[in-house]
């Protein structure tokens, strides 16, 4: 699934299927409980997306996942792990995503959360992409690692997984 997932910034004007919304909400709830987070899927709304991101997407983003949680030393790590889980899960459901990074409106996103005592750390745009995105230029395993002797399969698999995790 990692190899199939690419950033998509432009989306079709098509509401998310209600069954997919239910599946996404269940996965979000599972991650929220396991990692003490406050993620939330917002549908048919773009107020959590920054003006710049809206320009980049031609105003096609209509759904997003709020990435938030209570302040703690591991918040960024937990958000990164669970955010990656959600973008790969969305891809497995036939949806496309864009981790908007710093291009979000935290105040507007916070309005959708019951708990206002959290830090909104970003949003992930989600929907049916106009395209499936394009792969980024990738480095070879030799360019990002070094192993003396015969390289075992587990090492190459780990390097490949590590690299893909970095470019999500």
Ranges and model annotations:
Residues 1-168:
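Acidic, surface-exposed loops and disordered segments
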